[in-house]
Amino acid sequence: MRECISIHVGQAGVQIGNACWELYCLEHGIQPDGQMPSDKTIGGGDDSFNTFFSETGAGKHVPRAVFVDLEPTVIDEVRTGTYRQLFHPEQLITGKEDAANNYARGHYTIGKEIIDLVLDRIRKLADQCTGLQGFLVFHSFGGGTGSGFTSLLMERLSVDYGKKSKLEFSIYPAPQVSTAVVEPYNSILTTHTTLEHSDCAFMVDNEAIYDICRRNLDIERPTYTNLNRLISQIVSSITASLRFDGALNVDLTEFQTNLVPYPRIHFPLATYAPVISAEKAYHEQLTVAEITNACFEPANQMVKCDPRHGKYMACCLLYRGDVVPKDVNAAIATIKTKRTIQFVDWCPTGFKVGINYQPPTVVPGGDLARVQRAVCMLSNTTAIAEAWARLDHKFDLMYAKRAFVHWYVGEGMEEGEFSEAREDMAALEKDYEEVGADSAEGDDEGEEY
C-alpha cells in the first residue's frame, strides 16, 4: 500500500484537518465513531482508502494523522467534538503554552519540548504502514506554531525519513487582512528553513478564499469554517487519486515529477472549479469544457496573483466524477487555442491529466452545491513570485526599523537568521525570474502562442 501520514500543525493546520477528515469520512462512508457500515462499502473490497485510514481488529477506521498544537484549546475542541471517537487520544498532541505568534518560540524554546513526543507518535504511525509514501503537512505561515514548529518538524522528518516525500499545504498570509503583525517575519523564516526539506508546497491564501466564498457562494461574511470546507475540497481533490481507483491515477511522487522542474521551484498554484452555490448550480450545466475554462480564471485561484503576467512551467488537471478523456482532450485543445496561456519556452505545452470516477462529495449543510464533476488544477507558474515579492516587501518595511526583532532574539534566535532568510527569499525571487526568462536571446518571437 502507499500510505500517507497527515500532520496538522497549529490552529490553522488543526482546523483544516477537521474539515478534511470530516470530508474523507463522508467520501468513504465512515461514521464519526470510525465504523464503516457494511451496506455503505462502495463497490465492495475497494480498500484504496487504507492509504489514509488504518483498520483495527474491531473494524474501526483510524485516520493516519497527527494533530499538534503548542496550546490546548483548539485540539480540545477535537477531543470533545463530533469526531472525538475517530482519533486515537495519542494522535492529539498539545503543549501547555502557545508560541505567541513567534517563530522562535515554535522552533526553539517551546517547540523543542514537544518535538520528540510528536516524532515518536509519527514513528508509531509509520510502523503501521506497509509502504509509507510520504507526509502531508498542514500549517499556516503566519502563526508561531505553524511557522516555527513546522520547520523544526520538517528538518527532523528529513533526518528520520530521508527519501520520503513531504508535501505541504500552507496558509499564506493574505495581502490585505492579517491575523498577526509579525506574519511577514514568520513566513520568511519558515520558508527559508523549510525550502530544502519540502518537496512540494501548495499555497492557499485566506483572502483569495474569502473572495471566492463571497463571490461564488454568496456568503456575505465567510467564517473560517466556510474557508476550511472549501480548502478541504481542494485537498480532497488532490488526494482523491490516492484514496480511490480511477482511470488515470496520479500518486504523490507523480505530482512532484510533473510539477517541480527545479527543487526550489516547488510552489504550485491550486485552482478549483466549480465553486458554486446550490441555487446557481440548479440553472447551470457545468460541462467539462466550462469547468476546465474556469480553472484559468485568476478569480478561482487559491492565491492572489495573476498567471497572465507569468509563464506556466507545468500544469496538472485532476478531474473527478463523470468525466471521459475525450471531453478533457477537447477542453484542453480549446483552451490552447483560445486562452493566452504562455508556457516557458523550454517546456512544451504539457498538461498532465488525472481522472477519478468518484464524484465530489459535499458536506451536509455546507455551502457547495452537489455537482456531477469537478476539477482541481495545479499549475507551477512564475506568477507566484508576485506573492513572494509582496511578502518580502512587508518584511523589509519592518526589518529596516528592526521592529519586533527583540522578541525573536529573546527566544534564542540570532539577528543573522533574519538577513540570511531574507537573502534566501531574494534568491528565490531571482530563481523564478530566471526560469521565466526566455532561453533564446531573442525576446520578440514569444508572442505567437
UniProtKB/Swiss-Prot annotation:
Active site: E254
GO BP: microtubule cytoskeleton organization; mitotic cell cycle
Catalytic activity from the UniProt record: GTP + H2O = GDP + phosphate + H(+)
EC number: 3.6.5.-
A GO CC term attached to the entry: cytoplasm
Phosphotyrosine: modified positions: Y432
CDD domains in the cross-refs: alpha_tubulin (cd02186)
Residues bound to GTP: Q11, E71, S140, G144, T145, T179, N206, N228
Designated name of the protein: Tubulin alpha-1C chain
Species assigned in the record: Rattus norvegicus
